[in-house]
Amino acid sequence: MFYSKPIKIILYIGVIFCTSLSEYDMVLEEDSQMNRMVESMELFKMIGKNRWLSEKQLILFMNKTDILKKKISCSPLTSCFPEYDGPNTYEGAVQFIQKSFVELHNEEDKNVFVHLTCAVDKECMQLVFDLISDIIITFNQKECSML
């Protein structure tokens, strides 16, 4: 008797990637030569270039905004990004880091949705989840030719 398991096809509409804004001046525990932010950027680039995920939308959560706000005045962004010549402020740091991540996927057909988050802030996270839901609904409507 022949039994076969059903093949399940999973369709991914996007990839949610989380990075910590506060780790720009830290190194990995397992590799003291590797900056955590640089490693996060390399992983983000690899995921976006993966042949199975290359056409999928990328949703980037840049988390720990609260910690970055406190930390940036004491530890300059140039510790990770020597090329950074902007102001040593929260706004300047976020703008530069966000641009650096988005530029990793600058093809015209690749959208990177960036959301600044503070996971301990319930209102912020609810807003983020609502936005992600809207993205998913819009994608599904496009796939069904409703838009």
Where are these regions (language model features)?
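Conserved acidic residues
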Residues: 13
